[in-house]
Amino acid sequence: MANPSSFLLKRLMSITGLLPVGGFLVQHFFSNSYVFISPEAYNEHTKFLVSLPMVVLIEALLIYFPILLHAVLGVAIIYRGENNFTSYSFFRNWMFFFQRVTGFLALIFIATHSYTTRIKTGLAGEEMTFNYMVDILKQPLWFWFYFVGVLSAVFHFCNGIWSFFVTWGITVGPKAQRVSSAMTMGLFVVMGIWGVGILLKFA
């Protein structure tokens, strides 16, 4: 019989990863895709988002708190020895390893990106514009930091969907899990190209 606390931890982990954190990532990609239209369209959309009522409270409750909770739950699961390299295939064990690594990298990236584009600009009274992002991403070190960060966040989200399906009993057999793995890795490729494409428009 499963440990009740372990059962709860895994389900909280999967929910906070898929819904608020994953939802934010997808929404972020859609919002930044205005850059494909024009710099002006990107600036207008960014200005609209920043002007939303209680935007700071919304970000705190729907973005930053869930991400922090997801990170804490992840550390708790690793500390308890959950999801070790024992019960799955060689490939899936490596996916668990990369899930942990990309989770750590994504957390650093999200924290840095949030500080750079929200906190720093807010304290300085600056606007987060197309040119602001260009000034950041034209610097090679920053570009590669964003490149690794975006791909880490995308992998963590997509591979997390596979884990979500297993955790909630949606994919229970080996065949279903193989199909799910192929689908989520396909999603990783699509979203990875999407995210890198956005970065290149700024760079």
Q: Predicted regions span which residues?
A:
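Membrane-embedded alpha-helical bundles that constitute the cytochrome b-like, heme-associated redox core
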Residues: 1-203
